[in-house]
From Swiss-Prot:
This is ATP-dependent Clp protease ATP-binding subunit ClpX. It comes from Corynebacterium glutamicum (strain ATCC 13032 / DSM 20300 / JCM 1318 / BCRC 11384 / CCUG 27702 / LMG 3730 / NBRC 12168 / NCIMB 10025 / NRRL B-2784 / 534). GO terms for biological process: cell division; proteolysis involved in protein catabolic process. One of its GO terms (molecular function) is zinc ion binding. Residues 1-54 form the ClpX-type ZB domain.
């Protein structure tokens, strides 16, 4: 009976349940007790969380400068220097703004805080000029979640197609459903020129894939708390939603805007119709980027974007067509260039891949003829190299494959040099 009374009188840790005899120290606080082991565990948790917070703060303090952002873009993207400068400054200011918003309220003076408004980006330029790759590279440098959406797949809510909230779901997925990370991410919306309304004047008929989509995008571009269905698709009752604040998400909206140059030319007094008009030449097409530099909001309105939508995209960057020399540089110079990638694949089969200068020029010319820009280079390389890569694993006698201009044109077979015995595995 005495032992039972003694056991009942033993004090226990309120957290782990161990008695005072099972631990070294038991500290009392009111009707609550905590043992030395639980205190040690709490200290470890606090140190870990403080360490992570300090690491996050350090990362924020190491925001790259515009010159550093542009230099990083140079290692992956050829040319487009004016666009790189504009994007570097815009992205730098955007993430400076986020840091400023995190420190609001920490100042001791009574001066009102200056509110920094978000500046989303509009990119104008032809297909295959590097718009998407520029945005991807920016996200890679900043280590933030990145999502790509195609504006042509979007429709106004209630119609067949994707809701604009599905764009936000893609960003959440890229962030592994970490809401805090997603709210600092970048969303790239391509083909936005394809959702221009059918006429400059408002229509009484519904334009569910044009003006309707622009209207639906307005709120998420400016900043709103959106309800995202975790599984995607349409919203329905009794469904759980993820709340995502888009205020600090950077939107980069892009399109080729074919025909916009005519709108700008008309405004500048250059006639686009009539027998006396000169036929557009390749040289003039190459100078489209110079015309785009003169774009005004009124030109975009005439093209088919609504004024409210344009107002959410204050930063405008233009990218130009890539000429032959630029495309050859795209093939060879970037850190992950196509030539370097295919050389690595051939190395895995114990062979050296060599391109002559005229081969690279021919590949660039084919991309220009197809009007696919840098985007079409991989398809051309595949057409040339697939037959070789099919046979190469069975050809242990081949040590080097040489691609010249005739091979690139499909007029000759590649030159295959015999492997040196020490260099080729059996």
């Amino acid at each position: 009976m005495a032992r039972m009374q003694e056991s009942a009188d033993l004090l226990k840790c309120s957290f782990c349940g161990k008695s005072q005899k099972q631990v070294k120290k038991l500290i009392a606080g009111g009707a609550v007790y905590i043992c030395d082991e639980c205190i040690e565990l709490c200290n470890e948790i606090i140190e870990e969380e403080l360490g992570q917070a300090q690491h996050d703060e350090q990362e924020r303090n190491e925001l790259p400068k515009p010159s550093e952002i542009s230099a990083f873009l140079d290692t992956y993207v050829i040319g487009q220097d004016p666009a790189k400068r504009i994007l570097s400054v815009a992205v730098y200011n955007h993430y400076k703004r986020l840091r400023a918003s995190e420190t609001i309220g920490r100042r001791r003076n009574d001066e009102p805080e200056t509110e920094l408004v978000k500046s989303n980006i509009l990119m104008l330029g032809p297909t295959g000029s590097g718009k998407t790759f520029l945005a991807q590279t920016l996200a890679k440098l900043l280590d933030v979640p990145f999502a790509i959406a195609d504006a042509t797949s979007l429709t106004e809510a209630g119609y067949v197609g994707e809701d604009v909230e599905n764009i936000l779901l893609k960003l959440l997925q890229a962030a592994d459903f970490d809401v805090e990370r997603a709210q600092r991410g970048i969303i790239y919306i391509d083909e936005v020129d394809k959702i221009s309304r059918k006429s400059e004047n408002p229509s009484i008929t519904r334009d569910v894939s044009g003006e309707g989509v622009q209207q639906a995008l307005l709120k998420i571009l400016e900043g709103t708390v959106a309800a995202i269905p975790p599984q995607g698709g349409r919203k329905h009752p009794n469904q759980d939603f993820i709340q995502l604040d888009t205020t600090n998400i950077l939107f980069i909206v892009a399109g080729a805007f074919s025909g916009l140059e005519k709108v700008i030319a008309d405004r500048n007094g250059k006639k686009g119709l009539g027998f006396g008009v000169e036929v557009s030449s390749k040289k003039e097409e190459a100078n489209i980027v110079d015309i785009f530099k003169d774009v005004l909001p009124e030109d975009l309105v005439k093209f088919g974007l609504i004024p409210e939508f344009i107002g959410r995209l204050p930063v405008v960057a233009t990218v130009s067509n890539l000429d032959q020399k630029s495309l050859v540089k795209v093939l060879t110079e970037p850190r992950n260039s196509l030539v370097k990638q295919y050389r690595r694949l051939f190395e895995m089969d114990d062979a050296v891949l060599t391109f002559t200068d005229d081969a690279l020029e021919e590949i660039a010319n084919q991309a220009l003829e197809r009007k696919t820009g840098a985007r079409g280079l991989r398809a051309i390389m595949e057409e040339i190299l697939v037959p070789i890569m099919y046979d190469l694993p069975d050809r242990k006698d081949v040590g080097e494959v040489i691609i010249n201009g005739a091979v690139a044109r499909g007029e000759a077979e590649p030159e295959m040099l015999e492997a040196v015995a020490e260099e080729k595995t059996a």
